[in-house]
């Protein structure tokens, strides 16, 4: 989902596990709404920068353990997220902010170009694995590698995304 408003609608209609993939810059009102949602459902937010993670932690300090964080990885679309080799900076910001890091995610939007799904699927797999492996190597417990687009959903190798439906990520 892209907005807190979308999450509110889904939770109001029974969803109990939601992930806001669009980068948020959380203010006081958004923090209040996320806290209320976290009382009713499992909530995860994406972090694409160290600054964004720090802001999220500052705004949600009292609810940090109740809200999961996945770091957005740029797998070749170059729209948002960090390169796999930059993931540690964001992870440390997530940890310093007291947030609960559970994994990494990507959206291979470039897979929609003609003839690109196979190449984009491989880039997605490699980016998720490189980022997750770097985090695990320094002690971050990563339970989720989230990815997929319509063109790459069925192309993900066994060692790629652990899920394309957020519910499958362990907590």
Curated annotation (Swiss-Prot):
<dbReference type="GO" id="GO:0008721">
    <property type="term" value="F:D-serine ammonia-lyase activity"/>
</dbReference>
<dbReference type="InterPro" id="IPR029066">
    <property type="entry name" value="PLP-binding_barrel"/>
</dbReference>
<dbReference type="Pfam" id="PF01168">
    <property type="entry name" value="Ala_racemase_N"/>
</dbReference>
<dbReference type="InterPro" id="IPR001608">
    <property type="entry name" value="Ala_racemase_N"/>
</dbReference>
<dbReference type="GO" id="GO:0036088">
    <property type="term" value="P:D-serine catabolic process"/>
</dbReference>
<protein>
    <recommendedName>
        <fullName>Uncharacterized protein Mb1448</fullName>
    </recommendedName>
</protein>
<dbReference type="InterPro" id="IPR051466">
    <property type="entry name" value="D-amino_acid_metab_enzyme"/>
</dbReference>
């Amino acid at each position: 989902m892209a907005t807190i408003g979308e999450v509110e609608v889904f939770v109001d209609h029974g969803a109990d596990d939601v992930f806001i993939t669009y980068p948020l810059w959380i203010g006081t009102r958004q923090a209040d709404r996320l806290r209320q949602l976290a009382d009713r459902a499992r909530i995860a937010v994406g972090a694409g920068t160290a600054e964004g993670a720090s802001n999220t932690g500052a705004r949600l300090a009292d609810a940090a353990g109740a809200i999961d964080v996945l770091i957005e990885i740029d797998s070749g679309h170059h729209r948002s997220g960090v390169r796999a080799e930059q993931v540690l900076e964001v992870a440390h910001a997530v940890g310093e902010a007291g947030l609960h890091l559970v994994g990494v995610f990507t959206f291979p939007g470039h897979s929609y170009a003609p003839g690109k799904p196979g190449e984009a699927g491989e880039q997605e797999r490699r980016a998720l694995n490189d980022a997750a492996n770097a985090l695990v190597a320094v002690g971050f417990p990563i339970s989720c590698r989230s990815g997929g687009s319509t063109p790459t959903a069925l192309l993900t190798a066994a060692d790629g995304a652990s899920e394309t439906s957020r519910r499958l990520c362990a907590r």
